Amino acid sequence: MVLMMESQCEYFMYFPAVPISDLSDPAKYRTLPRRSHLYLGETVRFLLVLRSQSASGSSDGSCGSEQHSSRSWRELAGSLSAVASVSPGDSRQRTQPLYHDYHSSGDECVEDTDEDDAAEAVGCPGRGGPRYRGFRECKPLLIHNNPGNGVREFRRAPVQSPVDEPVVLSDEVIFPLTVSLDKLPVNTLKVKIIVTVWKQEEEKAEIQEHGYLSILQQKSPCQTFRQDLNTFKAQVSTTLNVLPPPTVKCQQMTVSGRHLTVLKVLNGSSQEEVCVRDVKILPNFNASYLPMMPDGSVLLVDNVCHQSGEVAMASFYRMDSESSHLPSMLSALEEQNFLFQLQLNNQPQDDSNEGLEVPLVAVLQWSTSKLPFTNSIYTHYSLPSIRLDRPRFIMTASCPSAVRTRENFRVRYTLLNNLQDFLAVRLVWTPEGRGQKEDPAVNAVVCHSPLSNLGYCRKGSTLSVSVAFQILRAGLFELSQHMKLKLQFTASVSNPPPDARPLSRKNSPSSPAVRDILDRHQASLSLGRSQSFSHQQPSKFHLTRTGSVMERRAITPPVGSPVGRPLYLPPDRNILSLDKIAKRECKVLVLDSHN
């Protein structure tokens, strides 16, 4: 009977959408609503039902035959065991990719640059690469569910959940089973749930004494497992669709020296309401390690911060507001923005990890009403990394909050130098931008001292200068953006190659830009090996780092210059870093004098 029992049973898998409190009555669980899809990361509770065809078919026979069949079925059903496993059914890429990979690169960082912003605490690597405005989609890294809401919770709350032990009825046996979908790839589209059913029997004394290895070495496998051929063994499987977690997009920006991160959570895959319980941004120091080597050793990434005192687990503070309270319910295609501000810990300069990348990860805790056996799901997303680049040379400005039109007032500019010694520091008022249209608002500002020479500036010192202004019309005006910094500092100039042609005005081209470069280079050599740095706020059209721009011009060889004798210019290795210098905005409100 046992030999053919597998084929004499019907197998059913039920995925109830609500908890089950009683399995004694088959009519109850058969009429419960069933789930048509699952969520990646949840714990799935389902039922496997084995229904005996012979037990139901023997009711037309004699009473003795029916009792014998029922007794045999109960003996067999009581000795059966079942275990469930899960595997990806389909992990191919979706038609419209939901995730895009941005792994710790400079292009990951999203800065919506604004001419009034100044870089203060953090920056982005790879400033020479392309810039992207708006939100960028973040890739899920890891998905897991609440560990305190697993099988143990079913035992603690038997009233709301099915029992763990199999239930044997007159013609069927019910196995309550559990599988977790938190060990699957993040791009899984379908899952295959496999259940193996077998009859548990005690091992022979010979096997318990010697073990299978010794017996297989002495006997043939067919002889050893001959009796196991009559043991009940069956395997059933089903495939279900899997919905991905909510979509998370990220935008990073720096406003007035404060680093802000906006996370956009979108319910773009489920027609059910998604409850966002918590959102966090944490440093991901696990990204500092490379994959394990064959010998078991682990290497560190050089440019990635392995531990940081500045960026701690609580450094990203979520700014709560009326529109972003938690928990938050998101309907289908509904999104919610969450604003985070980076709060760095004060660290000595020697202990600072400045210049190193700090990988970030976002942790989203969410759930739906269709998760009857999972309290919540935690999804980890990869965020663009940040780099600790505090400016060491800062220009601040202060002025009256409000003045009248055509009224003379003064703006006090203060320079805080913690960068290096400078031979000369000058402030130049440059309202016109290079190659840009004139701004009528800027033309209304009259600077009475467009050039201020502050002289030598030692590292650790503070310089101040007062500049007189007059504004001709009413409005709100910014007085730091167009105040250009000119810094002169010593620089080591390497020896020119022997075949390099010296720079001279005799063979210089007629291009004014080239001649200006040559003149400034000759002047720098005569001033004791110094270089000049011009710091100018970028316009909105420049997709460059907020707060600093270096002017670079190409030098064209003169017409008719000898082939193979290039122009020699000193390398730019000593050019100041753009992230080390910043300017703070200063705005004044101009009121109409007639009012």
UniProtKB/Swiss-Prot annotation:
What cellular component GO annotations does this protein have? midbody; mitotic spindle; TRAPPII protein complex
| Region (Disordered) location | 84-111, 494-513
Q: Which domain of life is it from?
A: Eukaryota
Does this UniProt record's set of keywords contain Iron-sulfur? Answer: no
Protein's UniProt name: Trafficking protein particle complex subunit 14
The record's statement on gene disruption is: Morpholino knockdown of the protein in early embryos results in curved bodies and small eyes. Morphants exhibit reduced ciliation in otic vesicles, neuromasts, and olfactory placodes. In a knockout model mutant animals show head to body ratios lower than those of controls. They have decreased brain cell proliferation rate at 24 hpf.
Provenance organism: Danio rerio (Zebrafish)
- Name the InterPro entries on file: TRAPP14_C (IPR055452), TRAPP14_N (IPR055453), TRAPPC14 (IPR031626)
Determine if Transcription is one of this entry's keywords.
Answer: no
Gene that encodes the chain: trappc14
What exactly does this protein do? Specific subunit of the TRAPP (transport protein particle) II complex, a highly conserved vesicle tethering complex that functions in late Golgi trafficking as a membrane tether. TRAPP II complex also has GEF activity toward RAB1A. TRAPPC14 is required for ciliogenesis.
Pfam families, from UniProt? TRAPP14_C, TRAPP14_N
Where does the sequence pass through the membrane? none
Q: Where in the cell is it found?
A: Cytoplasm, Cytoskeleton, Spindle; Vesicle; Midbody
Q: Which controlled-vocabulary keywords does the entry list?
A: Cilium biogenesis/degradation, Cytoplasm, Cytoskeleton
Q: List each coiled-coil range.
A: none
Q: Which GO terms describe its molecular function?
A: alpha-tubulin binding
One of the protein's GO biological processes: regulation of cell population proliferation
The subunit field of the Swiss-Prot or TrEMBL record says: Component of the multisubunit TRAPP II complex, which includes at least TRAPPC1, TRAPPC2, TRAPPC2L, TRAPPC3, TRAPPC4, TRAPPC5, TRAPPC6A/B, TRAPPC9, TRAPPC10 and TRAPPC14. TRAPPC9, TRAPPC10 and TRAPPC14 are specific subunits of the TRAPP II complex. Interacts with alpha-tubulin during mitosis.
